[in-house]
Amino acid sequence: MIQWFLKYRPRSLKDVENQDGAKKELQEWIESWLNGKPNAKAVLLHGPPGVGKTTLAEALAHDYNLELLEMNASDSRKLQDIKGVAEKASVYGSIFGTRGKLILLDEVDGINVREDTGAIQGILELIEKTKYPIIMTANDPWNPALRELRNKTKMVGLNKLGKYPLRRLLKKICQAEKIICDDEALNYIIDTSEGDARYAINMLQGIGEGYGKVTLDLVEAMARRKERELDPFETLRDIFWARYAWQAKNAATSAQIDYDMLIRWISENIPIQYDNIEDVWRAFDALSRASIFLKRAKGGDWDLLSYAYDLMSSGVAAAEIEKKKPNWKPKWKKYQFPSYIQLLSKSKDIRDTRDEIIKKLAIHSSFNKTLNDTYPFFLIFYKKYDKRLSLNTKEKEYLNSASKS
């Protein structure tokens, strides 16, 4: 099940709308490379999310018969990763019979200069030594960390996709996918997307495939959910009910809770959501692999965190085989808090009761000294002194239980 924004992505520059200026600049730049006299070694392609930066680079490679060597700079952030791209580009010849290569470094503004030591320097070295044209993409090219990159590149800006081109695109998709979309709903999607074609198409797909039609009520409900973080119960429902990998991953990355706690929530509720034992096994298998990647990521290899998110969300969602059937419908289940949280809560309540008793004992002594020296003996003889200490019912119940254990 392919995502629609990939399925309907323009393959050629002539199909890319509303970017005439950027297309002309890129064509002149790539032709200067092919003529052996590049006017710049690298281009920094910038613009808001979803305007088609990566698409434009791919279309350029397609039209000029160039092999695209792509890397996400915010995922592969170490100096050796960047250098690896240069080595592959310079050492290995093309196996596709193309006339050359085009190197694409996506999301360079996602590099954290504190954590990803040497990444920017690695890119600068790559630009200096490259034998092939380089395109970098960024949402925010004015990030101070990119100052040196800006000085070494030709900057090409992209426009937001206008309302009319976006409307044509969405109507084309609705017609191809046989999806009924109300005009009011279409207008709402276009307005809320603010020129982000990927956002608009994902919303159209999420509602269209889930409900078979796109209405204003459904679109407004989905937009409201995107404006806030999801609570754990909403997150679970969106993961377990997801038919597409991107839907599950969006739910995981929009959760109010962190990844450690999310794994506990998912683990607790897999047997509740899935009735088939094989589905349960596949879900736990994906979750266990997510835990392994998460542990390794915490060890310093943070590139693996994205794999952990993929497995705990998309991997768990894909465990239910019935979803592949066209008439599949999600089952509503009542989820529960992780038993781990319940145990912590119960344990805290017990400790609080114990501490209140110790405070009553520790009139002429420190809390810790009373806990370690006096309290163990008090448990044996407490019935002789409970009236003096004015113990309440909860404290008496605790002492009765503690003295028997």
From Swiss-Prot:
Gene that specifies this protein: rfcL
HAMAP family: RfcL
Domain of life (superkingdom): Archaea
Pfam families assigned: AAA, RCF1-5-like_lid
Entry's family note: Belongs to the activator 1 small subunits family. RfcL subfamily.
Organism: Saccharolobus islandicus (strain L.S.2.15 / Lassen #1) (Sulfolobus islandicus)
NCBIfam families named among the record's database cross-references: PRK04195.1-1, PRK04195.1-5
GO MF term set: ATP binding; ATP hydrolysis activity; DNA clamp loader activity
Alphabetical list of InterPro entries matching this protein: AAA+_ATPase, ATPase_AAA_core, P-loop_NTPase, Rep_factor-C_lsu, RFC_lid
PANTHER family on file: CHROMOSOME TRANSMISSION FIDELITY FACTOR 18 (PTHR23389), REPLICATION FACTOR C SUBUNIT 1 (PTHR23389:SF6)
Purpose: Part of the RFC clamp loader complex which loads the PCNA sliding clamp onto DNA.
Protein name as catalogued: Replication factor C large subunit
Single Gene Ontology BP annotation: DNA replication
Regions annotated as coiled coil: none
Binding-site residues for ATP, renumbered to this chain: 47-54
Record keywords, A-Z: ATP-binding, DNA replication, Nucleotide-binding
Subunit structure, as described in the record: Heteromultimer composed of small subunits (RfcS) and large subunits (RfcL).
Covalent S-S links between cysteines: none
